[in-house]
Regions:
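Cytosolic, long alpha-helical scaffolding segments
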Residues: 1-162
């Protein structure tokens, strides 16, 4: 029974890793389109956002299946609960990447816009998504804390952009 549960947890980790990669790709494309002033580069971001939505539904269903069929306790329950929180955040990140891609024509029409900070924020956010999922899958508390510390840098850049 436990081996089946472990296999399902491994599948959950794989799905989370794939969703994280999709989010990172969406952020990267939006930033690249902005940096290179090329609206066409941002076109796939909407599809990636839809993919992120689908991945959220898939992972949510997997988590609910684990909760209902396996009735996990303690550490396993916390892992599934954390996964549910992560997918909500990653889905929102996908939405925000799509929003950035959507407003790129506006940014490009204002020649005074400097994308340096936004592009740096995107690069940091993309890296943070990847590292967060990695920390979760490997159960690496130190990496998770490191990612949390990086959030302050993104916040500083965001304040400067506003």
């Amino acid at each position: 029974m436990r081996s089946k549960f472990d296999q399902q947890l491994a599948a959950l980790n794989q799905e989370l890793t794939e969703m994280g990669a999709t989010c990172a790709q969406a952020i990267g494309l939006a930033a690249q389109a902005l940096e290179q002033q090329d609206v066409a580069l941002a076109a796939p971001v909407g599809q990636l956002e839809e993919q992120t939505n689908e991945q959220e539904r898939t992972i949510e269903a997997l988590c609910l299946k684990l909760l209902l069929q396996q009735q996990p306790v303690a550490r396993d329950l916390r892992q599934i609960s954390a996964a549910l929180k992560m997918i909500t955040d990653m889905e929102r990140i996908g939405d925000q990447a799509a929003d950035i891609a959507e407003i790129i024509p506006f940014f490009l029409s204002h020649n005074t816009f400097d994308c340096t900070l936004v592009c740096r924020m995107a690069q940091q956010a993309s890296s943070m998504v990847t590292q967060s999922v990695d920390a979760f899958v490997r159960r690496d508390v130190y990496l998770a804390r490191s990612v949390a510390g990086q959030d302050d840098l993104v916040d500083e850049d965001f304040t400067a952009v506003k």
